[in-house]
């Protein structure tokens, strides 16, 4: 059986801790590989080597660093299918969805080709008599990215691009559930010209995470995952003086107004709610139709669409709408929450319980579920399910609908479907959520805008990619310079204003 190790100093290396985790094929339920789990000693060695490599990389001309990003874009395009196939095999998502995973990461690397412009400083001449003042952006040094299972290409690339093009070295700790693609990305970075040691991929579990958080060398940590772990990482990183950017869970609401195109809204809900088996932090998991008539008509349109969804392995190609969830534990958790919805009184309109696929009975497949008449006190409303489950909460008015989204503890993404501009503008201005869609169900910003949630979906004041990506991985230094005229002067004892 294949054993996956780490990427250290420009090559794949075997783990030395003797500890491993199983890597499954979610479609079959079989263990297809084992991944090494790093010890603290392995991690510390990788960090020390990264710190040494960063010295020269940080001093490299920003345009030369940008050329590495440019070459990487070409290599990602060249190996798109290879990366997507490996991603689908370990994660379970369909092949087209896996290609989208790589593509959205690639787009951030494209944006990072413009790093020299983003890193330019500011200059003021004659700030005082014979005095010039300028500010510069400098890399932090060694930074870390701790990335999730659901986007094993996109999120590592979102972290790597701004960090590396800003002159940092990075310790990447990907999910141990689907570790192949991050290792492949590291190989492509080397082929693109990234010096050895500047990117270290260290596979591991909590021992590696805690080692990153406690390291005195690592200056910043970026994380994407669940809210409890995001809070843990944010608090522990901050306690050791690190800059932290931690993104957690979501419960994204889509409000459907009475004037909305309900066919369009139903199509949007099916794609946004069930794509990738619901394992997306930007998935729509709560539909909020306004008015009983709107709700009845929406359910009527949703049911046949959901019942037609095709669930199967990625090898079936275009014949499949979504694949399995990532682990047996994830499947069991979804089934538990679905049953809680039934027990607490929600109406299960489309019942995917007991779903089984011939030939793949041991796979981690979950049938599609649609709930109606869900109320805010139910677990399926409060909890991020991370599965193919859509909950419908009926609202009597627009104010009630927006109030539901505002009062929920998560604030990652949201959407409203309406033909009325005043309603859309009011919603966009009042909602306390980080990413908002107007007739767009999954409002993931493009690479040159920032991505980030509010409330318990995001911890830290700087977001991912866009301008915030460069701000997070750099710090400013301001220099005040004065060149003596040659006339000897006495010491100054007062803090004088510049005149």
Residue locations for each model-derived region?
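ALDH superfamily catalytic-core signature
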Residues: 228-375, 438, 487-489, 493-499
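Hydrophobic face of amphipathic alpha-helices that form TPR/SEL1-like repeat modules
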Residues: 1-27
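Residue-level signal for inorganic ion chemistry
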Residues: 29, 65, 87, 109, ...
């Amino acid at each position: 059986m294949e054993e996956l190790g780490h990427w250290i100093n420009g090559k794949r290396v075997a783990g030395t801790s003797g500890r491993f985790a199983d890597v499954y094929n979610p479609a079959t339920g079989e263990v297809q590989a084992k991944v090494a789990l790093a010890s603290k000693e392995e991690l510390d060695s990788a960090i020390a080597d990264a710190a040494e490599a960063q010295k020269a990389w940080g001093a490299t001309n920003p345009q030369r660093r940008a050329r590495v990003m440019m070459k990487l874009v070409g290599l990602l395009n060249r190996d798109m299918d290879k990366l997507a196939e490996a991603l689908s095999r370990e994660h379970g998502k369909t092949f087209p969805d896996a290609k989208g995973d790589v593509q959205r990461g690639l787009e951030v690397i494209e944006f990072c080709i413009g790093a020299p412009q983003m890193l330019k400083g500011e200059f003021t001449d004659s700030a005082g008599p014979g005095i010039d003042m300028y500010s510069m952006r400098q890399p932090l040094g060694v930074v870390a990215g701790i990335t999730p299972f659901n986007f094993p290409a996109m999120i590592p690339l979102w972290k790597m691009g701004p960090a590396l093009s800003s002159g940092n070295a990075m310790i990447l700790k990907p999910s141990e559930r689907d570790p192949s693609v991050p290792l492949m990305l590291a190989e492509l970075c080397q082929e693109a010209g990234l010096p050895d040691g500047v990117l270290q991929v260290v596979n591991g579990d909590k021992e590696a995470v805690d080692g990153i958080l406690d390291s005195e060398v690592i200056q910043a940590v970026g994380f994407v995952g669940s809210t409890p772990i995001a809070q843990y990482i944010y608090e522990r990183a901050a306690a050791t003086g690190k800059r932290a950017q931690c993104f957690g869970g979501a419960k994204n609401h889509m409000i459907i107004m009475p004037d909305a195109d309900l066919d369009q809204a139903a199509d949007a809900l099916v794609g946004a709610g069930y794509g990738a088996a619901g394992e997306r932090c930007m998935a729509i998991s709560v539909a909020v139709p306004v008015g009983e008539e709107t709700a009845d008509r929406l359910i009527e349109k949703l049911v046949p669409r959901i019942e037609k969804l095709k669930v199967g392995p990625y090898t079936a190609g275009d014949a499949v709408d979504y694949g399995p969830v990532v682990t047996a534990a994830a499947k069991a958790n979804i089934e538990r929450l679905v049953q809680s919805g039934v027990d607490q009184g929600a109406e299960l309109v489309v019942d995917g319980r007991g779903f089984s696929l011939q030939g793949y009975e041991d796979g981690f497949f979950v049938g599609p579920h649609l709930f109606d008449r869900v109320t805010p006190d139910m677990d399926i409303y409060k909890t991020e399910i991370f599965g193919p489950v859509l909950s419908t909460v009926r609202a009597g008015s627009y104010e009630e609908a927006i109030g539901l989204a505002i009062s929920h503890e998560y604030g990652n993404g949201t959407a409203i479907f309406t033909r009325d501009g005043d309603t859309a503008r009011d919603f966009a201005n009042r909602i306390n959520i980080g990413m908002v869609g107007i007739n767009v169900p999954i409002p993931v910003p493009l690479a040159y805008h920032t991505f980030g949630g509010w409330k318990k979906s995001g911890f830290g004041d700087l977001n991912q990619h866009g301008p915030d990506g460069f701000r997070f991985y750099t710090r400013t230094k301001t220099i005040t310079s004065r060149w003596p005229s040659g006339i000897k002067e006495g010491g100054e004892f007062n803090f004088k204003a510049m005149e």
